[in-house]
C-alpha cells in the first residue's frame, strides 16, 4: 500500500469517527477491555496462591494492591505499544479504525512514550511483591510486543499461538506475587487453560473478521487456509481443554463438574459448526461462548474455595 492510499484511509477513518471524550480515548489507547478481562485471571492466580498456601487475603492486602495495579499497568503499557506498532494497518480494519492512534486523538510519539512509561511503572509495582512476578510480567510483555506484534503477527499463521503465550501469563503474575516458586501444579493449569482457550477464541474472531484481516494483509489462519481447516483447528484446541479440570482436583468435585460441563458445551457447539451452513454466524456463537466460558470458569475457581 503506497503512502497516498494510506493517507486516504487515515482521512476516511478520521471523518467517520464519532465524538469521544479524552477519557474514552485513553481507555481505547490502553485497551481497557483487555486489561479488565485479564485482571480477573491475575486476581484468580493471586487468590488461589493464597488458598493453597494457607494465607489470608487480609494479611496480604498490600500485595494485592501492588499486584493488581502493577499487572494492570504492564498490560496497559503493552497495549499502548501494540497500538503504536499497528497504527499503519489499524485504518484498514473496521474494528480498529477508530483507535485514537488512527484518528489522531493521540500522536504515535505519545502512544510510544506513554506505553513505555506505564510499562516500567508496572514493573516497579510488581517488584514490591516478588521478583518472580516482575519476571512473569516481563515475559508476557516481551512475548506480546516483540514476538507477536513485531514479528509473527504479519508473517505467520502461528501468530495466534505465539500471542496466546502472553495472554496466558497474567494468572502466573498473580500466583508469583504470593508464591514465587510457582511450584503448585494448579498454577500451571491456569497457564495452560489460558493458553489453549485463546486459540479457538481468536480463531473464531478471525473467521468473523476474515475480510478485514485479508484487507490488512494479516495472515490469520482463515485468511490463508480457509474456514474448514480453521474449524478443525478450533475443534482440536477446544478438545484439548477437556482433561485439564481433572488435574485441578484440589479445587474439588464441584469445580471439576462445572468445568467439564463448560468444556462439553463448547465441544458440542464446535461440532455443530461442521453441519451449519453459515460459518460466520457459527464463529460469532463460538466467540461469545468463549467469553462466557472464561468468565464462569475463573469465577468458579474463586467461589469454590469458600466451601
From Swiss-Prot:
Catalytic reaction(s) noted: heme b + (2E,6E)-farnesyl diphosphate + H2O = Fe(II)-heme o + diphosphate
UniProt signal peptide: none
Any one annotated GO CC term: plasma membrane
Gene3D superfamilies cross-referenced by the UniProt entry: UbiA prenyltransferase
CDD domains membership: PT_UbiA_Cox10
PROSITE patterns cross-referenced by the UniProt entry: UBIA
Subcellular location per the Swiss-Prot or TrEMBL entry: Cell membrane
Membrane-crossing segments per the record: 32-52, 65-85, 108-128, 131-151, 158-178, 186-206, 251-271, 287-307
Top EC class of this enzyme: transferase
Domain of life: Bacteria
Family annotation (Pfam families): UbiA (PF01040)
EC code: 2.5.1.141
Keywords: Cell membrane, Heme biosynthesis, Membrane, Transferase, Transmembrane, Transmembrane helix
Main location: membrane
Membrane topology category: Multi-pass membrane protein
HAMAP family, sorted: CyoE_CtaB
UniProt similarity note: Belongs to the UbiA prenyltransferase family. Protoheme IX farnesyltransferase subfamily.
Subunit-structure text: Interacts with CtaA.
Protein name: Protoheme IX farnesyltransferase
